[in-house]
Design a protein with these regions (language model features):
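Structural signal for interior beta-strand "rungs" in well-ordered beta-sheet cores
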Residues: 3-146
Length: 146
């Protein structure tokens, strides 16, 4: 059973898994998938094109699936895929891909501390830790365990 605050905005087209908690003032657009057992804290924005696996915790003021900060972006439908059991702390921004043929990808069991920014078309593997305020430019690959 889900626990979705009536003060959260969840587009009726969004696909929400089982046992998901969404706190007040979260904003979730229609082309979004949230897997089972996720927790979405207050003031999180999850934008179109974002896919969250299961067991993720997304903390306050985070923006997932923001448009890429790239002059080459022309408004194509692009994606951000996030795996399972990630901890995404406060004020994190993760951008979607620049082109429809690419994607931004975050693997499993990563820990993104406060203020991290992961730019467009980046591929983060599994078990990575990003310290406070880390900024990753677009088109990067971060291997497991970094």
């Amino acid at each position: 059973m889900n626990n979705i605050s009536p003060q959260a905005y969840v587009d009726p087209k969004a696909k929400i898994g089982n046992n998901v908690t969404i706190y007040p003032f979260a904003y979730i657009e229609g082309d979004v998938e949230i897997g089972d057992d996720c927790v979405i804290y207050p003031y999180v924005s999850i934008m179109n094109g974002t896919r969250l696996g299961r067991g993720n915790k997304v903390y306050q003021n985070t923006v997932l699936g923001a448009e890429p900060q790239d002059f080459n972006y022309k408004g194509e439908i692009t994606t951000l895929e996030i795996g399972d059991e990630n901890i995404i702390r406060e004020n994190v921004v993760i951008n979607r891909a620049t082109y429809a043929t690419g994607k931004t990808h975050i693997g499993n069991r990563n820990f993104l501390m406060e203020g991290v920014h992961i730019s467009h078309d980046t591929d983060v593997h599994d078990y990575c830790v990003f310290g406070y305020g880390t900024k990753i430019a677009g088109d990067c690959e971060i291997h497991s365990g970094i």
